């Protein structure tokens, strides 16, 4: 279906709580697919936006809870089914070279009915009923081929939330399934005002390190370091915000401070002179007191730095 037509129904989708994946974001996700897949699968395919950025000759598979959205998909080589991906998997037993997904964030699900399901049985814990995020990740992992790659857009909370989700996240890390975590700040793409993240999954990885990415900055982090951080996968844990620090010339800074003090003193003297004239008293005793203080520091043997803008002497103040 043409992008223009999708744009026209975006507001209707948003009113129903359906998240629309912009074309630019779909392209971003596909950029992390570093293999030549024979097929691509989206377990929550919506109107097919993520699948639409792949080669038209590639076999495409998708499942969507909303049958109305599924009917909008007009892609070549596409096979799709309507139904609940978690409770009614339409592609049981199938594996795919490439999986792209933007599952609904933190929706409810019923883990009690699926505890013995082949997709979830190997994990030591199931995600809580109130948050199905990691359930979708387990579903995706099950359907991923041994040499395949999965790229999933998720809510950042799954990177650090604890309890059951923390156990599942630890299992993913220890089994070396997580290849890369990418931070996507809010408003980076149209219709994505909240911050999100991209999680890249692979099986049979050659390294146990995880790559963290934030804009132009990347950091390769060992599994041991992640374990030391209680398996927290927040990008900000491993890539600190860079603050540009201006190089400071301490001598010049001190010189400027002395010159500023002199200018301030001159203005204070002007003010005191005006007050004394208004009150009909002499300012001379005040000037004499200042001279007395200056004589304590007016040592001819003392040299000033060559970088000084001007040498501050007793004469400067006497000119006031």
Please give the residue ranges for each predicted region.
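Long recognition/docking surfaces used for binding and targeting
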Residues: 1-10
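Conserved S-adenosyl-L-methionine
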Residues: 9-101, 106, 147, 155-156, ...
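Hydrophobic alpha-helical scaffolding
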Residues: 63-64, 98, 126-130, 228, ...
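Switch/connector loops and helix/strand junctions flanking conserved nucleotide-binding motifs
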Residues: 86, 107-109, 161-162, 190-193, ...
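Mobile active-site "lid"/loop adjacent to the S-adenosyl-L-methionine
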Residues: 104-135, 157
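Conserved Class I SAM-dependent methyltransferase catalytic core
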Residues: 128-193, 198
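Flexible, glycine-/basic-rich loop-and-beta segments that form/coincide
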Residues: 190-253
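Basic, amphipathic N-terminal segments
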Residues: 234, 238-317
């Amino acid at each position: 279906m043409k992008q223009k037509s999708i744009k026209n129904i975006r507001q209707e989708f948003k009113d129903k709580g359906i998240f629309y994946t912009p074309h630019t974001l779909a392209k971003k996700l596909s950029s992390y697919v570093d293999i030549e897949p024979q097929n691509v699968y989206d377990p929550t395919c919506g109107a097919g936006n993520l699948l639409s950025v792949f080669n038209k000759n590639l076999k495409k598979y998708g499942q969507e809870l909303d049958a109305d959205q599924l009917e909008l998909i007009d892609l070549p080589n596409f096979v799709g089914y309507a139904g609940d991906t978690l409770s009614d998997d339409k592609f049981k037993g199938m594996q795919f070279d490439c999986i792209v997904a933007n599952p609904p964030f933190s929706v409810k699900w019923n883990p009690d009915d699926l505890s013995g399901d082949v997709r979830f049985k190997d994990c030591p814990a199931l995600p809580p009923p109130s948050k199905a995020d990691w359930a979708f990740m387990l579903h995706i992992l099950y359907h991923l081929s041994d040499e395949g790659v999965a790229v999933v857009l998720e809510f950042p909370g799954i990177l650090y939330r604890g309890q059951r989700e923390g156990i599942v996240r630890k299992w993913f890390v220890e089994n070396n399934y997580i290849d890369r975590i990418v931070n996507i700040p809010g408003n980076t793409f149209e219709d994505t005002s909240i911050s999100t993240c991209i999680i890249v999954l692979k099986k049979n990885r050659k390294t146990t390190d995880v790559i963290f990415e934030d804009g132009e900055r990347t950091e390769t982090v060992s599994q041991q370091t992640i374990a030391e951080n209680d398996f927290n996968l927040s990008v900000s844990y491993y890539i600190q915000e860079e603050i540009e620090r201006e190089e400071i010339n301490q001598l010049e800074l001190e010189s400027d401070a002395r010159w500023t003090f002199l200018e301030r003193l001159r203005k204070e003297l002007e003010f005191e002179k005006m007050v004394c004239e208004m009150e009909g008293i002499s300012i001379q005793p005040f000037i004499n007191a200042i001279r007395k203080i200056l004589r304590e520091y007016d040592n001819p043997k003392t040299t000033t730095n060559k970088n000084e803008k001007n040498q501050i002497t007793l004469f400067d103040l006497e000119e006031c």
